[in-house]
């Protein structure tokens, strides 16, 4: 990852969503991006030029555009029509983004467009967030990583966020090795990142 002092940046062409630039780099704001928050807090998976990433819950492509600055290919899955319009515009400026309009809980819908990936990044705020991540492990290479951004209030607004996180972790441990778990405060309240690796 590229840092200018304590500021996380990415090396692509700016102006994607009105982000600031610094010395020719795009500032990656942890208050706007949960992945940037994870890196700022000392966690995350290093993004490298040869990586292929499956990004679930691409939304309007803000974080996707930064990931694309670092890696070979980003398969960006989004289901909602309005954000998809913005994502398509981002993909026109980032040729290594493959926008896919599909339901992330049904990976069989986009399997024909996929190849094996090094990283699955899951940011779909649904009650079955863990299940969605697990269904998409079919695309993850052995030794690859899963980063799950858990929005605890979307899983169960009545339960304590720590309990929700513990349950998600237990579910993932059945198939993956947990590398890191951390809350994203102060950047994103009641959000936690779970970083896992697939067993060889």
From Swiss-Prot:
SUPFAM superfamilies: S-adenosyl-L-methionine-dependent methyltransferases. The keyword Membrane does not apply. InterPro entries: Fibrillarin (IPR000692), SAM-dependent_MTases_sf (IPR029063). It is an enzyme of class 2 (transferase). The keyword Chaperone does not apply. Its EC number is 2.1.1.-. One of its GO terms (molecular function) is RNA binding. Involved in pre-rRNA and tRNA processing. Utilizes the methyl donor S-adenosyl-L-methionine to catalyze the site-specific 2'-hydroxyl methylation of ribose moieties in rRNA and tRNA. Site specificity is provided by a guide RNA that base pairs with the substrate. Methylation occurs at a characteristic distance from the sequence involved in base pairing with the guide RNA. Interacts with nop5. Component of box C/D small ribonucleoprotein (sRNP) particles that contain rpl7ae, FlpA and nop5, plus a guide RNA. Belongs to the methyltransferase superfamily. Fibrillarin family. This is Fibrillarin-like rRNA/tRNA 2'-O-methyltransferase. It comes from Methanoculleus marisnigri (strain ATCC 35101 / DSM 1498 / JR1). The gene is flpA.
């Amino acid at each position: 990852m590229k840092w200018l002092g304590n500021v996380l940046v990415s090396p692509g062409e700016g102006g994607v969503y009105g982000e600031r630039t610094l010395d020719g780099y795009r500032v990656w704001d942890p208050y706007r991006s949960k992945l940037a928050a994870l890196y700022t807090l000392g966690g995350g998976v290093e993004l490298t030029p040869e990586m292929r990433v499956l990004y679930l819950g691409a939304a309007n492509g803000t974080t996707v555009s930064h990931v694309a600055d670092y890696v070979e290919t980003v398969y960006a899955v989004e289901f909602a029509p309005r954000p998809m319009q913005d994502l398509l515009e981002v993909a026109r400026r980032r040729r290594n983004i493959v926008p896919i309009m599909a339901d992330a809980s049904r990976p069989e819908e986009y399997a024909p467009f996929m190849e094996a990936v090094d990283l699955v990044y899951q940011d779909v705020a649904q009650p079955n967030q863990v299940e969605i991540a697990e269904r998409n492990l079919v695309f993850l290479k052995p030794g690859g990583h899963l980063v799950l951004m858990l929005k605890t209030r979307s899983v169960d607004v009545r339960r304590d966020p720590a309990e929700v996180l513990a349950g998600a972790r237990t579910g993932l441990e059945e198939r993956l090795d947990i590398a890191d778990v951390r809350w994203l405060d102060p950047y994103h309240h009641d959000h936690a990142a779970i970083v896992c690796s697939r067993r060889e």
